[in-house]
């Protein structure tokens, strides 16, 4: 039975779920619209609304909490990122900084007068290969 189970479960480990949701949340903030499956979108909506609520506060503590929730690692590099950084490619840092700045500067100020419901889920046709329910999750215009 699924009584009192609120978490998203798709047969992955909890660490994999956390990383997947953090990456999807970064993509949603960066592009403001992503295409995914319906169960993932419903779970992502919960996290996105919490991040917008943090962005509306616009304090240093809120920024630090957002960095932690998005799993942004400014000081820890993987071996691939270290090779890119030695070559002068700092795009790894720039994208993460753009995501945080966009969250707090654009999205936080856009939804100041709104108390919740910052995202919308639009259902699409099922995927051809496995008949998965596809949808688009996006931030509202204002």
Curated annotation (Swiss-Prot):
The GO cellular component terms are: cytosolic large ribosomal subunit
Q: Which family does it belong to?
A: Belongs to the bacterial ribosomal protein bL17 family.
Bridged cysteine pairs (disulfide): none
What is the gene called? Answer: rplQ
Q: How does it assemble?
A: Part of the 50S ribosomal subunit. Contacts protein L32.
Which InterPro entries does the record cross-reference, listed alphabetically? Answer: Ribosomal_bL17 (IPR000456), Ribosomal_bL17_CS (IPR047859), Ribosomal_bL17_sf (IPR036373)
In terms of superkingdom, the source organism counts as Bacteria
One Gene Ontology MF term: structural constituent of ribosome
UniProtKB keywords: Ribonucleoprotein, Ribosomal protein
One BP annotation, GO = translation
In its UniProt entry, what is this protein called? Large ribosomal subunit protein bL17
